[in-house]
Amino acid sequence: MSEDLHDDPQDSDSPPTRKRPRPGERRLQILQTLANMLEQPGSERVTTAALAARIGVSEAALYRHFASKAQMFEGLIDFVEQSCMGLIRQVTDREAEGPQQALRILSLLLQFAEKNPGMCRVMTGDALVHEHERLQQRVNLLMDKIEAQLRQSLRGAFEGSATPTVDVQVTASVMLAFLMGRLQRHVRSGFARKPTEHLQDSLMRLIR
């Protein structure tokens, strides 16, 4: 979510002026800056004071765009959810149901987290410690949606089993645990251990 947010250089002969962001621009800038701050390995809890200082505005200016810091994090969770569900739709639209579809979903979600370390901290809940509990509840609901899709992908994979429903549920649960474990390791290592490390070999062991 990062991009250059600096104003264009001003002509040296004219007095410096501060551009007023267009509607929605400042809101996006706040979310981008918050995401960038979460990408710093070992970063502590982000305060609104630090966020405002990074952007170069007052804390009051932040609250003209968001009612609370929790609402800022909800904006990041919205981005994570839209991105994850969009990636899942890409897979389900192109590939038939089965174990390979489920593994492809895991692969894309891990790649997304690797490219967006700040969002990875949101997905694991690491960035939400000491924040409003509803934020973690929203992330939990997202993980429930992902697990439900994994079950859907695996639905026909155990038709010859004596306990197909249990097998689907257990396999989907193990896959989600693998996903979360990789994300948590990425965060704990200061983003040094990549979620996609030895990915294909690891994924194949999930369906042996």
Language model features: what each stretch is:
Residues E44-A50:
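Ser/Thr-centered, proline-biased regulatory motifs
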Residues G56-F66:
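Short hydrophobic/aromatic patch on the recognition helix
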Residues F66, G125-E131:
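Short helix-capping/turn signature of helix-turn-helix
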Residues E25-N36, Q40, R54, Q71-R94, ...:
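Alpha-helical structural segments
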